[in-house]
């Protein structure tokens, strides 16, 4: 296969594995990085170069995770997501395994090139291993309350530090977003009950029942998450808008309209994640 065709093929495979997760990785990381550009007197070319470097970290960040996640969850994907590359036959299991090793090597190599990102890189590697290679990653508490919080820290801390040194305000907001994610990411499991049950996972809907988990998310997790945003100084940036978005999210969670509807609810949730980070970046630049 010609080199250009091979490169195009690999780009297509990268998109196939990762595009559904961009609104929870590359996009929010990029949005948060904009906030780190405030007050910098660097030339535009330097800022662009730093952002391009961040993209070289974010790309293997999500590719390494999605590859290993899908390599270790083929049985579930055959039920919940049969159109993914491995169950659909687009990529063989062995091919995905080879690519996961390559993505891991690139991801670690970027951090070794820029050691300031090594803590976040090692955190994400550990989080991915915890999720994909241990039984604790199959339990609702380990999967969401722990792993999504540590993953959010790795994503947001690296996205800021790739542009500018961290500040007390940026750290406070990162920790607030980690708490928000730990409480709310259970939303992703509402759409995958059938496959999760088949492989023995203990997600919130399987432990507390479908409607029970929806009540927990809507009336306990979402209000608590808003309180954490308030403690981090984020909710005050646009209280009416953020309150309304969380109310709409809760309304969607309570509706038992099928897995496809629940998937759209999860995507809406990731857009809220991006919006919150946009508010933070706008505030950093004095725009709100």
Curated annotation (Swiss-Prot):
Subcellular localization: Membrane
Membrane topology category: Multi-pass membrane protein
Keywords: Membrane, Transferase, Transmembrane, Transmembrane helix
Domain of life: Eukaryota
This protein's GO CC annotations: membrane
Induction notes from the record: Expression is induced under erinacine P-producing conditions.
Gene Ontology terms for molecular function: transferase activity, transferring alkyl or aryl (other than methyl) groups
Pfam families on file: UbiA
Keyword Lyase: no
InterPro entries (UniProt xref): Prenyltransferase_related, UbiA_prenyltransferase, UbiA_sf
Main location (coarse class): membrane
Enzyme Commission numbers on file: 2.5.1.-
Transmembrane segments: 24-44, 51-71, 101-121, 145-165, 215-235, 268-288
Cofactor annotation: Mg(2+)
Positions in coiled-coil regions: none
Keyword Transmembrane: yes
Record function comment: Polyprenyl transferase; part of the gene cluster that mediates the biosynthesis of erinacines, cyathane-xylosides that show unique biological activities, including leishmanicidal activity, stimulating activity for nerve growth-factor synthesis, and agonistic activity toward the kappa opioid receptor. The role of eriF within the pathway has still to be determined. The first step of the erinacines biosynthesis pathway is catalyzed by the geranylgeranyl diphosphate (GGPP) synthase eriE via conversion of farnesyl pyrophosphate and isopentyl pyrophosphate into geranylgeranyl pyrophosphate (GGPP).
Similarity comment: family membership: Belongs to the UbiA prenyltransferase family.
UniProt name for this protein: Polyprenyl transferase eriF
Organism: Hericium erinaceus (Lion's mane mushroom)
Organism classification: Eukaryota, Fungi, Dikarya, Basidiomycota, Agaricomycotina
